[in-house]
Amino acid sequence: MIEVNDLHKKFGKVKVLNGIHLEYHPGKIYGLVGENGAGKTTLFNCMTGIYDYTGSITKSKTLKAGYLSASNFFYSQITGLEYLEFCMKAKGLPVSTLTIQHLNEIFQLPLDRYAAEYSTGMKKKLGFMALLLQENDVFILDE
């Protein structure tokens, strides 16, 4: 479970988040809807530790959360396969080419091509594949 209590975030004098309270429970799907600039991405960046904030965000100790941000960055000299292998190693997981190939039967990505050359949609798929391979319990997906 993830619990957000009295969350506040300011950029300079501009209040972006003001007293947010939320609970996310395992096994459920949640959607966060709001106008552009409403603070959705800021909330996700607070929840994942990218931004400092005031208030509290409590996560179960064993909870593994993965975050797919709105913008993706891929090194120009790394293939889709190399990116997925890197993401698995970063989480301390053994790299299984067979598991990657099996998952790619669903996503149908050209994993031998440089990820930086992928279309925007292909980059999103690659990022989501990485989250699935990392065995996360919760997926925070921004746009």
Residue ranges with predicted function:
Residues 133-137:
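A short, proline-enriched helix->beta-strand linker immediately N-terminal to the Walker B motif
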Residues 24-26:
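Conserved hydrophobic segment flanking the Walker A/P-loop of ABC-type ATPase nucleotide-binding domains
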Residues 30-35:
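The feature captures the beta-strand-to-loop junction immediately N-terminal to the Walker
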Residues 97, 101-119:
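Conserved ABC nucleotide-binding domain
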Residues 2-4, 17-19:
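Conserved structural motif at the start of ABC-family nucleotide-binding domains
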Residues 139-143:
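Catalytic Walker B motif of ABC-type/P-loop ATPase nucleotide-binding domains
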Residues 71, 76-91:
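Q-loop/switch helix immediately C-terminal to the Walker
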Residues 48:
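Helix-to-loop junction immediately C-terminal to a conserved catalytic motif
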